[in-house]
């Protein structure tokens, strides 16, 4: 319960808090590890240099400049870490292609993320602190029943998370299909333009 009560301690920093100077890889890892403590469950690192390099290779993250990373690199890495257990790299890349096209968009995206994050923390505190307190209150003398009810709550949360994951996947899939149709239309227009050019050339020859 104390962990839930102290969720406010894990608030995401304001954009102005990010370093104004470019950082080397080890500095990036150190800075972001502090910001990602909320999702750290065990002793395994949340972010490593090899992960960052893989994101660059996958075109999910822009390459560093002279081995240094800028603010938008940090923001994008933070955004990746929060959803990488839910979304595939290709899906995150697709989302970024719409929402994080440049540094200006990256800043706006982070501000929306920060706002959503804070609201979700409040929702979680309001909803689940009440439920946990009710479990403890109604079963105050039965430790086994408390454990069973808490595990049932954990299972229900997992099920809810899975349903939300499915909805997110469906939305991304539908958007990808729409995106492909747009590409097909563009390709069709290009083909028609080329055909018109060829027809004009042939008419001139005749």
Model-derived segments and spans:
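Basic helix-turn-helix/winged-helix DNA-binding cores
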Residues: 1-100
């Amino acid at each position: 319960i104390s962990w839930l009560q102290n969720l406010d301690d894990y608030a995401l920093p304001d954009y102005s808090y990010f370093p104004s100077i470019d950082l080397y890889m080890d500095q990036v890892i150190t800075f972001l590890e502090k910001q990602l403590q909320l999702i750290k469950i065990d002793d395994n690192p949340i972010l490593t240099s090899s992960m960052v390099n893989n994101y660059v290779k996958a075109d999910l993250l822009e390459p560093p400049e002279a081995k240094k990373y800028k603010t938008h690199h940090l923001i994008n890495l933070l955004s990746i870490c929060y959803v990488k257990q839910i979304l595939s790299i290709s899906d995150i890349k697709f989302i970024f292609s719409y929402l994080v096209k440049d540094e200006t968009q990256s800043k706006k995206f982070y501000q929306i993320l920060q706002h959503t994050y804070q609201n979700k923390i409040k929702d979680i505190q309001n909803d689940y602190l009440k439920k946990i307190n009710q479990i403890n209150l109604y079963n105050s003398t039965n430790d086994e029943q408390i454990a069973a009810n808490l595990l049932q709550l954990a299972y229900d949360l997992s099920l809810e998370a899975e349903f939300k994951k499915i909805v997110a996947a469906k939305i991304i899939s539908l958007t990808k299909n729409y995106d492909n149709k747009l590409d097909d239309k563009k390709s069709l227009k290009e083909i028609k333009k080329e055909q018109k050019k060829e027809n004009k050339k042939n008419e001139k020859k005749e």
